[in-house]
């Protein structure tokens, strides 16, 4: 499984670079930094079925850092949600693959994103909704470290501590880079670990190299 994931990730990286180059625009850094995370989720962790993307028991994934859409598109294509050839329509007029994910355009997209800071709140709502509907699913949210400049994220962390959803996982892509500078230059946060733990949330850290050890 590990070897397969590594090969999947390598191909997905190639697809991201190719599609962004073909489009002539796109967020390459934020997309490439998310490859290992997305490959692990879709290739080994999440319960999902490309043949039945609306299955009520499917695990949900929210790309809160919506500018990394090329990474999500490449992963969805790789795992069978739509033909790989469609990747070359990224950002084209009338394409289903726009600059940010659109819920109504493409199978496998759970939430239209792009305006930063909304994904954790939406994921919390989805996770709590499973207790109401009786459906058994997990929710995974991927946000960027620069995205945590948005105050709504911290309100969502506070709400997570109150409601304590057992089926919600928030992943921070801690790449230390934002659109026009480093995260440290733009808005120093100090210890992200200490801040998150201060909300009473369980936290663990991983690096891309861990899956090869």
Per-range role (PLM):
Residues 1-12, 16:
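N-terminal hydrophobic or amphipathic helices/low-complexity stretches enriched
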Residues 10-11, 34, 112-113, 140-143, ...:
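N-terminal start-of-chain detector that recognizes signal peptides
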Residues 6, 21, 92-104, 122, ...:
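Thiamine diphosphate
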Residues 27:
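Globin-like tetrapyrrole-binding proteins
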Residues 16-19, 31-162:
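Cofactor-binding active-site loop characterized by glycine-rich and histidine/acidic residues
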């Amino acid at each position: 499984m590990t070897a397969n994931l590594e090969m999947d990730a390598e191909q997905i990286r190639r697809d991201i670079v190719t599609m962004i180059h073909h489009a002539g625009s796109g967020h390459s850094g934020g997309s490439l930094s998310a490859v290992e995370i997305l490959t692990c989720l879709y290739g080994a962790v999440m319960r999902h079925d490309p043949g039945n993307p609306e299955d009520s028991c499917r695990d949900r994934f929210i790309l809160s850092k919506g500018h990394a859409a090329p990474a999500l598109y490449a992963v969805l294509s790789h795992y069978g949600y739509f033909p790989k050839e469609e990747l070359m329509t990224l950002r084209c007029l009338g394409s289903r693959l726009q600059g940010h994910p659109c819920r109504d355009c493409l199978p496998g997209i759970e939430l239209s994103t792009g305006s930063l800071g909304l994904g954790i709140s939406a994921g919390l709502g989805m996770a709590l909704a499973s207790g109401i509907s009786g459906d058994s699913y997990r929710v995974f949210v991927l946000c960027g470290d620069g995205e945590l400049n948005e105050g709504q994220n911290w309100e969502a962390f506070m709400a997570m501590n109150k409601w304590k959803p057992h089926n919600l996982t928030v992943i921070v892509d801690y790449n230390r880079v934002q659109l026009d500078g480093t995260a440290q230059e733009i808005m120093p946060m100090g210890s992200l670990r200490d801040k998150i733990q201060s909300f009473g949330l369980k936290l663990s850290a991983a690096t891309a190299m861990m899956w090869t050890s």
